[in-house]
Amino acid sequence: MGGGNLHSLPPENASVSASYAVTVGNTKLSDAPVLFFVYCHKAFRAQLVELRRFATDAAEADSFSGDLAVELSRKFEFLKLVYKYHSAAEDEVIFLALDKRVKNIVSNYSLEHAGTDDLFTSIFHWLHVLEEEIGSRSDVLREVILCIGTIQSSICQHMLKEERQVFPLLIEKFSFREQASLVWQFICSVPVMVLEDFLPWMISHLSHEEKIEVENCIKDVAPNEDSLQQVISSWLLDDSQSSCGTPTEIMKGVQYVNVSKSLKKSPESHPSSGCFQRFWEWSKKSLSIPNVGRSPIHGLRLFQNAIEKDLRDIQEGLCQAKFQTLILDLDVLMARLNFLADVLVSYSNAFKKFFHPVLEEMTARRSSTAKQFNIDDCLENFQRLLYKSADDKTKTDNFLLQLQEELESLIIQVTKQFAIQRTEVFPIISKNCNHEMQKQLLYTSIHVLPLGLLKCVILWFSAHLSEEESQSILHFLSLEDSSPKKSFPRLLLQWLRFGYSGKTSVERFWKQLDVMFKVRCSCQKEHTEEASGSFSNQTQLQLCKVSKDVYPRKKDKSSTCFMSMDLAVGDMYETPYSSRMNQQMTFSGKLKPPLHLPDFFGEKNMDDPMIMDVKPIDLLFFFHKAMKMDLDYLVCGSTRLAADFRFLAEFQQRFHMIKFLYQIHSDAEDEIAFPALEAKGQLKNISHSFSIDHELETKHFDKVSFILNEMSELNMLVSTINTTAADHDRKMKYERLCLSLREICKSMHKLLSEHIQHEETELWGLFRNCFSIEEQEKIIGCMLGRISGEILQDMIPWLMESLTSDEQLAAMSLWRQATRKTMFVEWLTEWYNGHVLQEEAGEANNDPFGDSDPLEIVWKYLFEASADGEKGSMRSSLLKLPKTNFTGIMNQPPPNYKVEVGKKEEKDLERSESKKICRGSNQEGDKEQTDKMSQKVSQFGPSKKYEQLLTMSEEELVVVIKKISCDSSLDPQKKDYIKQNLLMSRWNISQRTYNLEPSSLSSNMETVHGQHPSYRDPHSLIFGCNHYKRNCKLLAPCCDKLFTCIRCHDEEADHSVDRKQITKMMCMKCLLIQPIGANCSNTSCKSSMGKYFCKICKLYDDERKIYHCPYCNLCRVGKGLGIDYFHCMKCNACMSRTLVEHVCREKCLEDNCPICHEYIFTSSSPVKALPCGHLMHSTCFQEYTCSHYTCPVCSKSLGDMQVYFKMLDALLAEEKMPDEYSNKTQVILCNDCGRKGNAPYHWLYHKCTTCGSYNSRLL
């Protein structure tokens, strides 16, 4: 109901599900551990397909209820969670490592990660509407399915791009050990509660063979520590029940605890895993268990004391760090601060997820203490300041003072929070929860920490415990039996014992932390200095170097990567974690520094290009604005099509224009703008991601074209069939096509909008800052030089329609500036004036009959087609004409304009007969009069038959107009049209008679010189001349003569004709002189004057491929700009696309040939471009090079003359100079390299000592 199956789309080149296998080649996971993330991609794809099928099946079965909406919402919650951790791992682990080796690759992918939150927000909104049963359920279901499709297309395209570009580079640039360390760092950076659900969920979507590969991969990348390996195996191999839920349970929907209805009103307190539900259910059962020993919640007091003590120690250390003697300890202090910030963030999360809802339940929401737990704002500000510590330059006295102030503020907030918890929270929990429930609460809270951070916390915490306190914690962990698996508690117990044993001192612990955070800082600094051109990249290799350089591993890559004998259990290098990854998850990217947008934006709106100094490259982003508006049009138009199929033709026409213009823009960026940007040294690879976007987005356009074609065919069928069962089926198919179209248009809107936004964010400033004004003009000129005049006639109005008046002025100013050395303004003026006149004429005419002759319409209505029942009855009463067929009149041969004209008595006779017919007199002779009139009409032609309208009196006109008004066969628009043209018929006939006067006079002499056909091939009777094949002649206004073409005129006359002044032509079939046009205006002729017609150049041709260049403002022979030619804006010349790389010389065509002195710009002869940049005719070049090898203008060599120069060397070697000249030298200037030098004396040949050329002259 309302959902329906989406219509089948055109087949792809390769299935998306198998794309990962194609993009990364035949590499196996056992050879490249980093492909673990590609297997995650496969799980995401499978999950999205499953969710889409779930929604569509429920919609088709009309079984979509509020409960199903809740279930689907929970599935998407889990998908959002694991995808965000996956994205954070790529941003903060994979991408940073890759950017260390290959610059400018990953920044765009990080931007794409940031755009996924909006996708999930939209689907959650519509699922909530569906759950609350707001509005029409069918409409909401459609929106849900559309949102799922948008999420699917966006995420899948992003993953496909990564598989095509990022992962092949990771495999190429990183060794097996380095890849393994990156995968393990990701696993150690994910909270345990998420990891326990994520790994079983992931492998549940893989085949049996792939599942085994993933299991072996994770075991290989993990350290060879028995307890840790057992934990990993328990997460992977048990597919019946994990500690935090099975994959099956997850996909059925993670059931949050139904503690009270109030929890639903506080979604921020909901965990994203099933741990919370099982904790609560277990804790309810454990209330009856008696309390034994000390309260487990006392351990949190110890934990808080350790945090406060370390914060105070660091505060004292910072006070001493401003002295130069202790500045070396600052790095260790900063590492300790980063670690404690991570601990506080995890501690705060645990309270929000577990302690907060428990406390609210116990106090029946009467306590306000729960709301005082949040110190996120303070932590966020503090961690943002810690980011500045990555650059050593910021560690000045001012920075230290600011850090001390923030730390003091943090200590105050933390102390207050801990005090509230000790006095209000812990007593309530101790009073209302038995020891077993407290143990479960603490144990479950541990799962909030990532595995790597958890180990660091246990080692750090154990160093702060006394012997009695340590024994208490050890006893707590040894008695832990709430979990169905014992491996994880045993691992925690092992880590705690190691820390308590003292094998890892506090000093060593802090040094190891210092190494982890110091590597990050140095990488960030190096990246800032070396790759400042990329906005959002920050690089690090946290573990790769450390693990490779410090700790040896087995050489066999298929074996375990770590050797337990070489690594102590307590070393943190075993379990590295990325604190940035969890910070990104916790604070949703708020800690990241803002993108390095171009300086010209300042504090103003970056969407408004008029706030800045406009530069040539901004023309691209004016185009972006127009494209974004058209994307909105596609979304709105696809929605409208479901209700109005008549809108299909307009939508299809607009879509094809958008597709065509987008393809032109994308090709220009890929082939011109992006290569120019990457040619800058430090910006290599920065645009490849956008080129992949262009390729993939083309497929979306093709899908829309495919659907629109099917809708067009279906629309014709629907419109011609009555309401039947077949018609109903077609209607349902049309609705499904509309839904598919809406989905793709929404996906395109999302993908292209983000693509454009990322281009502007990442590349706009680079184009503006890295290129000078001249270089930007060259880039824009190269892009515009590929666009033909016909496309510009569509593009310019389309672009101007989307811009404000100020933006229009700016855009056209940039356009004119980039083309200032060409004739573009002249072409624009001529085209625009004609375009406006044509539009005004069209608006004024508003012809409901199309382009038909208005007099012909009136004539046919009054005097012809009497076989028509309704119209014939009216005409019989008006004109008393019998039912005579005049349909063959317009097909008669062209009349002979030299006879039957000028005979006054016959004209008078015809007029009198017409009057009698119109007045209805002499009814008995109607047939004879009609036959006689038809004969006269066939002799006089169309222009004379209309003169019968001149004989109608005013009374007759009134009668005719009343009858027209009563004619039910005409719609109101046609009635007004016929009445208006009937009233204007006298003026129209007089004007037409005046225009035809020169060709209508009867004379044995030609009225206009040349008013006769001319033939290109007299034997085959092919019209034209030696220059062109065409069916018309041009009337030269300068001498009032007809010539076949302008070149014929210039050859015969002693002057040149101005093509702009030519306004009339003569059709060589009917010899009618008429205004310039593509076809003959004679209604009995209407012949085409030529396959090619240029209104600007007044050029007709019927055999060659010709195009009008808007920058030359001339017609050129060729297929067109962007096909086989382009226009160089500096040279102001159309050149073959093979000459993209050439020597530019300003307006080189606007000169005479140096040999024959003909003006090259308007010459029709082929032109040869010389290496020096000068031009000459090809025929002149062939003749000239028979005796010369230097340019006649600049004297440079016309080519590679090394063979000739070697011949001269051999010739001079055989010559013997007289003794008096043997030691003499001459000063020469080389014409090729332009350098001066000394050459041995010779009467003719002088060799340049620099380049070896003999093309030189004496000074």
Curated annotation (Swiss-Prot):
Q: Where is this region: Disordered?
A: 904-938
Q: Which GO terms describe its molecular function?
A: ligase activity; ubiquitin protein ligase activity; zinc ion binding
Q: Which annotated residues bind Zn(2+) 6?
A: C1128, C1131, H1142, C1144
Q: What does the entry list as the binding residues for Zn(2+) 5?
A: C1109, C1112, H1127, C1134
Official protein name in the record: Zinc finger protein BRUTUS-like At1g74770
**PANTHER family in the record, alphabetically?**
RING FINGER AND CHY ZINC FINGER DOMAIN-CONTAINING PROTEIN 1, ZINC FINGER PROTEIN
Q: State where it is primarily located.
A: membrane
List positions binding Zn(2+) 3.
C1067, C1070, C1080, C1085
Pfam families per record: Hemerythrin (PF01814), zf-CHY (PF05495), zf-RING_2 (PF13639), zinc_ribbon_6 (PF14599)
Keywords, alphabetical: Iron, Ligase, Membrane, Metal-binding, Nucleus, Transmembrane, Transmembrane helix, Ubl conjugation pathway, Zinc, Zinc-finger
Q: Which GO terms describe its biological process?
A: intracellular iron ion homeostasis; iron import into cell; iron ion import across plasma membrane; proteasome-mediated ubiquitin-dependent protein catabolic process; protein ubiquitination; regulation of iron ion transport
What membrane topology does the annotation report for this chain? Single-pass membrane protein
Positions with a binding annotation for Zn(2+) 4: C1094, C1097, H1108, C1115
**Residues annotated as transmembrane:** 441-461
Tell me the residue numbers annotated for binding Zn(2+) 1: C1025, H1027, C1045, C1048
InterPro entries, per database record: Hemerythrin-like (IPR012312), RCHY1_zinc-ribbon (IPR039512), Znf_CHY (IPR008913), Znf_CHY_sf (IPR037274), Znf_CTCHY (IPR017921), Znf_CTCHY_sf (IPR037275), Znf_RING (IPR001841), Znf_RING/FYVE/PHD (IPR013083)
Q: Where are the zinc fingers (CTCHY-type)?
A: 1089-1152
Report CHY-type zinc finger ranges: 1018-1087
Checking Gene3D superfamilies in the record gives:
2.20.28.10, nmb1532 protein domain like, Zinc/RING finger domain, C3HC4 (zinc finger)
